[in-house]
Amino acid sequence: MSKQTAIEQDGVILEALSNAMFKVELQNGHVITAHISGKMRMHYIKILPGDKVKVEMSPYDLTKGRISFRYK
């Protein structure tokens, strides 16, 4: 996603899946699967169901994304 323009949206974590994957409900009502970005893994940032997050998605596949920020 570095060379293309990533689509950023806010969402809420619905459920935690295996391998640091999460189901995220976006503001527009769509539910996608997303994984944690590398920097968040490196700094041990915990994400729990109910947390508000910022998700980056590729314009080519809008069903998968990367969690880049957790709001406080």
From Swiss-Prot:
Highest taxon in the source lineage: Bacteria
Positions of the S1-like domain: 1-72
Compartments where located: Cytoplasm
InterPro entries xref list: NA-bd_OB-fold, RNA-binding_domain_S1_IF1, S1_domain, TIF_IF1
Keywords, alphabetical: Cytoplasm, Initiation factor, Protein biosynthesis, RNA-binding, rRNA-binding
GO MF term (any one): ribosome binding
Cellular component GO terms held in the UniProt record: cytosol
SS bonds (residue pairs): none
Keyword Transferase carried by entry: no
Subunit record text: Component of the 30S ribosomal translation pre-initiation complex which assembles on the 30S ribosome in the order IF-2 and IF-3, IF-1 and N-formylmethionyl-tRNA(fMet); mRNA recruitment can occur at any time during PIC assembly.
Function: One of the essential components for the initiation of protein synthesis. Stabilizes the binding of IF-2 and IF-3 on the 30S subunit to which N-formylmethionyl-tRNA(fMet) subsequently binds. Helps modulate mRNA selection, yielding the 30S pre-initiation complex (PIC). Upon addition of the 50S ribosomal subunit IF-1, IF-2 and IF-3 are released leaving the mature 70S translation initiation complex.
Family: Belongs to the IF-1 family.
Name of the protein in its database record: Translation initiation factor IF-1
